[in-house]
Amino acid sequence: MASRCKIHLTVAYLLILCILASAQSKQMTTETVVLNVTALSEINQTKYNVQINLNIGLLDNDIFINGAPLKPSGVTRMTCPALLLDGYNVSSGNSVDGLVSCELRLMVNQSYVQSDAAEQLLFLVLSQEIIQLADEKVQQPEISEVEIMWNQSSEQMTQVTSIYPSARSKLSIIPRENDVLVTDASVQSAVEDQVRNTTSHYLLKNSETTQEEIAAPGKLPETPLRMDPETLYESREEEERRSDSLLLEPPLSGSMSSYSVACQWVEKLRDKLRRFLSDSVPLFFLVMWVVVVGVAGSAVVIKILDLIFPSCEHRGFFHLNPETLMPDDEKVSLIDNMEGDMTEKSILLIEK
C-alpha cells in the first residue's frame, strides 16, 4: 500500500515538473529595432532627425511592439519616446535631454517562408511613419521598412532596414481614420495593478478607503470608519473641491468584457482555420490532380493496347438467329447432336 502511494506521488511530481517546464519554455522572443528617421514640421518646415527604439516581441505567432499587441495587415497608431539627434527642440519645449513623445503609425505584414535548409521561417515586414512630435504635427518624407526573419527552431532573428519615399509606401495610402489606437502599455499595466474597489468613493482625505482595509470592531469590511466632521476636511472649499473631483473621476478599469474575450477567441480561431486551410487545400488539389491524371492515363493506355493488340475472339457475345431466337453456335451443336442420335437409333434397329 505504501509503495503504491509512493508511485502515485512520483507520477504527480513528474507531471507537475512537465507542466512547469512547458510553461517556462513559452517565453517571448524580443528584438530591438533602432530607426533613424527624418521628420518635417507641417507649420514651418523645420527638419528633425529622430531616433526611435522599438522592442518587437513574438509569442505564439502574436506580434507585440513595446508590449502592445499588433494585428497583422492593419495600421496601429501608438505613442512612444523619441530622441532628437540634432539638438533642436520642438515647439512645445517640454523635451527632457532630447527625449520627446512621438506618435507613430505602424503596419506589420506576416508570412511564412522556407529556407534553403527546409526550415520554416516567420517573415515580418514592419513599416513605420511619424505623424506627431510632442504637440507638433510632422511629416515623414521617407518611410522606414524593417524586414525581420525569425527562425522558430533556433529562436534567432535577423533584420534588414530599408528606406524609400513615402509615395511608394502602402502605409501612406491607407487612411488614418481606420487606424487602431493603442494607449501606452505602461499606463495600462499600472492601472491594472491597482486594487479594484467594490464600493463607491467616499468623501475622505484618502478616498480609496477599501484598499487594504482592516475592519474595526463592530464594523463590516469595506465600510468607511466613522470620523468627526471637523477632521474630514481642512476647509469648506476643500470639501467642495474634493467632492466635485470625485464625482467627475472616471471609474477604474475593470476586467475585460465577455464580448472582447469572444472577439479574441474568434480572431484566434480564424487564424488557426486560415493556417489549416492554407496547408490542407493545396494537398487536396494535389491528390485530386493525381487521381484525375491516373484515371485518364490508364484509359489512354488501355485504348492504345486495344489498338495494338486486338483480340481475335469476343467471348461472352452470342449472335442470335432471328428465326429461331437461338445462338448460331447452339443451333449447330443441337443439329449435330440430333444427327448423332438418329444414327445410333438406326444402328440399333439394324442390329435387331
UniProtKB/Swiss-Prot annotation:
Domain of life: Eukaryota
Disordered: annotated span: 206-245
Entry keyword Membrane: yes
Ranges of compositional bias, category Basic and acidic residues: 225-244
Compartments reported by the entry: Membrane
Ranges facing Cytoplasmic side: 303-352
Cellular compartments per GO CC: membrane
InterPro entries: GINM1 (IPR042319)
Residue runs in coiled coils: none
Glycan-linked positions: 36, 44, 89, 109, 151, 197
Membrane-spanning parts: 282-302
Signal peptide annotation: 1-25
Topology feature Extracellular, residues: 26-281
Keywords of this entry: Glycoprotein, Membrane, Signal, Transmembrane, Transmembrane helix
Keyword Transmembrane helix among UniProt keywords: yes
Predominant place of localization: membrane
Topological category with respect to the lipid bilayer: Single-pass membrane protein
Record protein name field: Glycoprotein integral membrane protein 1
Organism from which the protein derives: Danio rerio
Gene that this polypeptide is encoded by: ginm1
